[in-house]
Amino acid sequence: MDFHHKNNYGLYALEILAQYHNISINPEEIKHKFDINGVGLDLTSWLLAAKSLELKVKAVKKTIERLNFIYLPALVWREDGHHFILTKVNKESNRYLIYDLEQRNPRVLEQAEFEDLYQGNIILITSRSSVIGKLAKFDFTWFIPAVIKYRKIFIETLIVSVFLQLFALITPLFFQVVMDKVLVHRGFSTLNIITIALAVVAIFEITLSGLRTYIFTHSTSRIDVELGAKLFRHLLALPISYFESRRVGDTVARVRELDQIRNFLTGQALTSILDLLFSFIFFAVMWYYSPKLTLVILFSLPCYATWSIFISPILRRRLDDKFARNADNQSFLVESVTAINTIKAMAVSPQMTNIWDKQLAGYVAAGFKVTVLATIGQQGIQLIQKAVMIINLWLGAHLVISGDLSIGQLIAFNMLAGQIVAPVIRLAQLWQDFQQVGISVTRLGDVLNYPTESYQGKLTLPEINGDISFRNIRFRYKPDAPIILNNINLNIKQGEIIGIVGRSGSGKSTLTKLIQRFYIPENGQVLIDGHDLALADPNWLRRQVGVVLQDNVLLNRSIIDNIALADPGMPVEKVIHAAKLAGAHDFISELREGYNTIVGEQGAGLSGGQRQRIAIARALVNNPKILIFDEATSALDYESEHVIMRNMHKICQGRTVIIIAHRLSTVKNADRIIVMEKGQIIEQGKHKELLSDPESLYHYLHQLQSD
């Protein structure tokens, strides 16, 4: 079981797996350190090399059935050296997604195919950050540290609960005395004393109950604030791939699950649990009164639990269905509001309404099923309660008639039994809330358990110069997706103006996303000033890279706030200078509120050209050393474009500029033009050089635009 093979896929596998965990790797350095004999990495050398990269690795034997429970991706190795990476197991369809190291492509294998390839040997791989992330996984255990943090408050709540239970114990005893002593002996003085005592107990009980609710709600509200803050910070720290692979409405629906958790934390469920914990005291007193009646109460508790357990899985499935339909509705609503101009322009409101009606009907039906099942569950609990009450009444009356129990004792017993049964019934009736909050925690965990962009230990430098290098880049968005960039080698010098052109889908925008470190390449390195971006702090990098897209989003704030978004305390003069460079100052000055004009949601109060010029000013205001125009002028009218192109010399001065454009006139003055086709660079040179070759793609595209 070694990696000796004439093609030696071990080193390549290590490169792929390291980059998956956002760890930079220099294959030549690894080969020099660990491939001492020059014949490839054996298993021991491979494990040592992986550990040197701060990866946690372990070679184990696993049956195919156990592969459902391991952390993926993992490296499957074979005796013949044809190792492959296992990236996903679909246990429902019995399919396996692997990365073929020989073909350098993902493959989907059926069960039989996988069984033929798999020999039971696998290397489990995780990064230290992954392990920390798993330990900090968001589920119900997340609240344990919060409880420990506020343990003083919870101890105070516990002490108050003890006193409340004691008061609850005293009241039935007073009633027993009244029934058995006061009424029989006509003891008015005793009655007055007991009445005063009951009034004092009632006042203290109400006060302590209110105090407990206040303390408990105060502490749970602080936990709620912490969770809400953590959620928003985590959401903004997620990689761009998370948002691109999910619908906006689905993400919003998951975030809104925080409301369910909040309601559960601040509701009566947890205080009911505290009340239930003290039930053993009541059981002791009740047993003293009547073991037979106590046994009836004891036997009823498993009935409550059994009924709740029976209902739970059905209720959970229906709640899952309700959530999924709600997420669909959220997504459709967000999509419809966002695309309202298109919907109205195409007069498709009736069709959209029909879709909404069907989805809404499905959601209401799912909600109705949940309500019906919850009602059945609650009525079942009520039925058990009534049955216990009838049995106790019948049996208690027999005991009173036979002289084994006094009337006062029977009344006191029933009051004590109510102190036990009431929280049990409340918990049983709140079981739906518990199921809902369980689903909410799971759904919210999809956001909070998703790994964020790594910042710890990343490279930060005071200021970049602007040299950019792509070395042997191969990239795809998902393991099972087609290759977007393949064998990209490109060097861009500091201060150079580069134009990138090509057909749609050729990989132009993807190239700039790698510069911004939105993604890590599957193979190769992206370097800025000689530093590997896989090791760079994303925030440090993005603060020094200005980006203008074709469709830029402005926030519902003033123009000055939008331009100075990265630094709200920026001097006004700096904002105005950037606006002048972008050709936006003149039209801003003509607005009634000038730079204090609120632009509306997504800049709806401005024209497309005005929004674009503000976006350009926003990109320029921090004086970035690298500036990216991704179809930035394609949506502009010719006058607006002329203003920007007239200032282009000043805009580009002292910066490395990358201009992506379909309109070739935008890039004709670039220092160098890169032509891309199907994820590869096929041509590069100046405008005239590329036009001189009649067989070139650039010449063909230029001819099309000239016509």
Curated annotation (Swiss-Prot):
<feature type="active site">
    <location>
        <position position="83"/>
    </location>
</feature>
<feature type="transmembrane region" description="Helical">
    <location>
        <begin position="295"/>
        <end position="315"/>
    </location>
</feature>
<comment type="function">
    <text>Involved in the export of hemolysin A.</text>
</comment>
<keyword id="KW-0354">Hemolysis</keyword>
<dbReference type="InterPro" id="IPR003593">
    <property type="entry name" value="AAA+_ATPase"/>
</dbReference>
<dbReference type="InterPro" id="IPR003439">
    <property type="entry name" value="ABC_transporter-like_ATP-bd"/>
</dbReference>
<feature type="domain" description="ABC transmembrane type-1">
    <location>
        <begin position="154"/>
        <end position="436"/>
    </location>
</feature>
<dbReference type="GO" id="GO:0008233">
    <property type="term" value="F:peptidase activity"/>
</dbReference>
<keyword id="KW-1133">Transmembrane helix</keyword>
<feature type="domain" description="ABC transporter">
    <location>
        <begin position="468"/>
        <end position="703"/>
    </location>
</feature>
<dbReference type="GO" id="GO:0005524">
    <property type="term" value="F:ATP binding"/>
</dbReference>
<dbReference type="GO" id="GO:0031640">
    <property type="term" value="P:killing of cells of another organism"/>
</dbReference>
<keyword id="KW-0204">Cytolysis</keyword>
<dbReference type="InterPro" id="IPR036640">
    <property type="entry name" value="ABC1_TM_sf"/>
</dbReference>
<dbReference type="GO" id="GO:0016887">
    <property type="term" value="F:ATP hydrolysis activity"/>
</dbReference>
<feature type="transmembrane region" description="Helical">
    <location>
        <begin position="191"/>
        <end position="211"/>
    </location>
</feature>
<keyword id="KW-0547">Nucleotide-binding</keyword>
<dbReference type="Pfam" id="PF00664">
    <property type="entry name" value="ABC_membrane"/>
</dbReference>
<keyword id="KW-0378">Hydrolase</keyword>
<dbReference type="GO" id="GO:0015421">
    <property type="term" value="F:ABC-type oligopeptide transporter activity"/>
</dbReference>
<dbReference type="GO" id="GO:0005886">
    <property type="term" value="C:plasma membrane"/>
</dbReference>
<feature type="transmembrane region" description="Helical">
    <location>
        <begin position="158"/>
        <end position="178"/>
    </location>
</feature>
<dbReference type="InterPro" id="IPR010132">
    <property type="entry name" value="ATPase_T1SS_HlyB"/>
</dbReference>
<feature type="binding site">
    <location>
        <begin position="502"/>
        <end position="509"/>
    </location>
    <ligand>
        <name>ATP</name>
    </ligand>
</feature>
<feature type="transmembrane region" description="Helical">
    <location>
        <begin position="387"/>
        <end position="407"/>
    </location>
</feature>
<keyword id="KW-1003">Cell membrane</keyword>
<dbReference type="InterPro" id="IPR027417">
    <property type="entry name" value="P-loop_NTPase"/>
</dbReference>
<feature type="domain" description="Peptidase C39">
    <location>
        <begin position="2"/>
        <end position="125"/>
    </location>
</feature>
<dbReference type="InterPro" id="IPR039395">
    <property type="entry name" value="Peptidase_C39-like_A"/>
</dbReference>
<dbReference type="InterPro" id="IPR005074">
    <property type="entry name" value="Peptidase_C39"/>
</dbReference>
<dbReference type="GO" id="GO:0030253">
    <property type="term" value="P:protein secretion by the type I secretion system"/>
</dbReference>
<dbReference type="InterPro" id="IPR017871">
    <property type="entry name" value="ABC_transporter-like_CS"/>
</dbReference>
<keyword id="KW-0067">ATP-binding</keyword>
<keyword id="KW-0813">Transport</keyword>
<keyword id="KW-0812">Transmembrane</keyword>
<dbReference type="Pfam" id="PF03412">
    <property type="entry name" value="Peptidase_C39"/>
</dbReference>
<dbReference type="InterPro" id="IPR011527">
    <property type="entry name" value="ABC1_TM_dom"/>
</dbReference>
<keyword id="KW-0472">Membrane</keyword>
<dbReference type="InterPro" id="IPR039421">
    <property type="entry name" value="Type_1_exporter"/>
</dbReference>
<comment type="similarity">
    <text>Belongs to the ABC transporter superfamily. Protein-1 exporter (TC 3.A.1.109) family.</text>
</comment>
<protein>
    <recommendedName>
        <fullName>Alpha-hemolysin translocation ATP-binding protein HlyB</fullName>
    </recommendedName>
</protein>
<dbReference type="GO" id="GO:0030256">
    <property type="term" value="C:type I protein secretion system complex"/>
</dbReference>
